[in-house]
A protein has these predicted regions:
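Active-site environment of divalent metal-dependent phosphoester hydrolases
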Residues: 108-112, 131-138, 188-190
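Short hydrophobic/aromatic-enriched beta-strand-loop microsegments
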Residues: 123-130, 147-152
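Polyanionic/metal-chelating signatures
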Residues: 1-127, 257, 263, 288-289
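His/Asp/Glu-enriched, well-ordered alpha-helical/loop segment
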Residues: 100, 139-247, 267
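Amphipathic coiled-coil/heptad-repeat helices and related helical stalk/stem segments
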Residues: 87, 110, 134, 164-165, ...
Length: 290
């Protein structure tokens, strides 16, 4: 679910109106390592791929059954509907293009395998997350119109994360693929502007001549593209949502602070106004002694 960072008592109130849903898939050490530790499948990379293919085959048959039912019912036949399966309904949503795949993948060979599988079953991959070998996969990512969502300089914490370079994000961008900055670290994710600056600097040191205006797209327009929302957010243009951050200095400076945040044209944060700053809806009934 894609959320907007707005005040609400419920997740439903934060949902981005009309945004497509997303589904995470994973390949590599995480599924095989976790499931293997429980003596469950998939415990190898091969079984992981086999399990995915089996699931897509099952979803394809499930979709065919419902398509046949709808066609028969529309023709006036008195026919009972197939049984519902919420797991397969989710996969059918992917096959019909309503749910976007975000694929956890590190290595180029597994990205290639996932692309092959998407072609076999006729769905699209929105993005590969982590993609520490994105610089190797960049041409195939550009051809398939798949974003790579990457760290600036985080690697080496497990075997499949070893073969990264600091120029990873810059090289993916240089090859005209969709490069996106990210982090699942609780500190780095608060300073993605600085992560962009690090990745841009690495690219410039090798002579790629990346401008700040291009680099900032890694956190804005390209990120919106990975969510299927680049027609509404990610850049300042007529007809798009008025989502704007005003910085105290250059956005990529380590000294820069977000001064104001506007979402949908409304001021949602103002560093100089305590009444327009984040508050929690937890413990509202508890009186704190003055």
């Amino acid at each position: 679910v894609t959320l907007k960072n707005v005040r609400s008592l419920t997740v439903q109130g934060m949902k981005f109106p009309g945004a497509p849903y997303s589904l995470k898939m994973a390949c590599g050490e995480n599924p095989k390592g976790y499931c293997g530790s429980l003596n469950q499948l998939p415990s190898t990379r091969m079984v992981n791929m086999a399990g995915y293919r089996a699931a897509w085959i099952e979803a394809t048959e499930y979709k065919r059954g419902w398509d046949n039912y709808v066609a028969a019912a529309s023709a006036g036949e008195d026919i009972d509907p197939p049984g519902r399966d919420l797991r397969l309904e989710t996969l059918v949503g992917v096959l019909e293009g309503d749910i976007r795949i975000h694929n956890h993948c590190y290595m180029v060979d597994e990205m290639a395998q996932m692309i092959d599988m998407s072609k076999e079953f006729g769905y699209e991959i929105a993005a590969f997350h982590h993609a520490v070998e994105g610089y190797k996969a960049a041409p195939m990512l550009a051809e398939a119109n798949i974003c790579a969502v990457m760290w600036a300089d985080w690697w080496g914490f497990k075997q499949e994360a070893f073969d990264m370079v600091r120029e990873n994000l810059a090289l993916v961008d240089y090859m005209q693929a969709c490069a996106v900055i990210h982090s699942d670290d609780p500190i780095h994710v608060q300073r993605l502007n600085q992560e962009v600056a690090k990745a841009m600097s690495a690219g410039n040191r090798m002579g790629l001549e990346i401008s700040p205006g291009r680099a900032i797209r890694w956190a804005t327009l390209n990120a919106a593209k990975s969510l299927g929302l680049d027609d509404q957010i990610g850049s300042l243009a007529p007809g798009k949502n008025a989502d704007i951050v005003l910085w105290s200095q250059h956005p990529l400076s380590v000294y820069s602070l977000a001064q104001q945040v506007w979402i949908d044209g409304h001021l949602r944060f103002d560093r100089g106004d305590a009444s327009v700053q984040p508050t929690s809806d937890f413990n509202l009934g508890i009186i704190t002694p003055g």
